[in-house]
Amino acid sequence: MFDKLSIIFNSDRKRKVHLSKAITEISLKLKEQQDRLDEAIRRLRERDKDLFEKVIRSQIEGDIARATIYAQEISDIRKMIKIIYTAYLAIEKVRLKLDTVQELQGVSLVLFPVMRILGELKEQVRGIAPEVALALDSITSSVNSIAIETGALSEKTFVPTVADEQAKQIMEEAQKMAEVKVRELLPELPHPPSELPKRVAKQVQSSNKKSLSEDMILNYIKTTGGFIDVDYIAKNFDVSKDEVFNVLRRLEEKGLIVLEG
């Protein structure tokens, strides 16, 4: 009798060790996909920054049509960044959830929502990061295999409603966090092009000496919706950064602007 109990105990222990190893491998593979997504975000942010500068330059030069094209491309890029950030954050939540798998009895409550989430993420990033989508498909198969091996999934298995609810909640949380993150990382898009850029351009062209007026800065600020890039102003108005800061300080002293950060 004791020999039989010992065999059962050893069998369960081996299954737990195997489960732990398999979960760890999946978590590491998911981390690799997070690294890929992080690199994709970095590249898109660089492109966003380049286009943002082109929008400002085009508006100042009075090329409204070109500025509009650049602004639309920025909008598309930011939609992609949001999708990728959502995937990144959702994967992080999946990894944390996998870490909670300790006992064989609780496997199904973790693996079912994980499979739902990975399947949804695969479809979301397919057109943006196809290599990540392929990897997620493979990882989903691995999770499915674990579910079958542990008995959590079979032909007679009924997927509890709570699994779908957990998956939905995790995705919604990731989307909200991604929206906040994108707003924090990227400057607000310039206001719709107006006649202001043309006036700024005329002021620059009519200035024969390297000087920067308060009106120029105010018009620039109105054009960008409050965003100030000192390096850009210094370069495009052909003045020093100190002169830019001096004008900004004068405007702040007059109560015309408020400098933050």
From Swiss-Prot:
GO terms under cellular component: cytoplasm; nucleoid
Main location: cytoplasm
Keyword Cell cycle: yes
Stored InterPro entries: Cell_Div_Complex_Comp, WH-like_DNA-bd_sf, WH_DNA-bd_sf
Superkingdom assignment: Archaea
Gene induction: Induced around the genome segregation and cell division stages. Down-regulated after UV irradiation, indicating division inhibition in response to DNA damage. Expression is highest in dividing cells.
Keywords noted in UniProt: Cell cycle, Cell division, Cytoplasm
Location(s) in or outside the cell: Cytoplasm, Nucleoid
Span list, region Winged-helix-like fold: 213-261
GO BP, sorted A to Z: cell division
Domain comment, as recorded: The winged-helix-like (wH-like) C-terminal extension is necessary and sufficient for interaction with CdvA.
Functional note: Part of a cell division machinery. The CdvA, CdvB and CdvC proteins polymerize between segregating nucleoids and persist throughout cell division, forming a successively smaller structure during constriction.
SUBUNIT field: Interacts with CdvA. Interacts with CdvC.
The name this protein goes by in its record: Cell division protein B
Biological source species: Sulfolobus acidocaldarius (strain ATCC 33909 / DSM 639 / JCM 8929 / NBRC 15157 / NCIMB 11770)
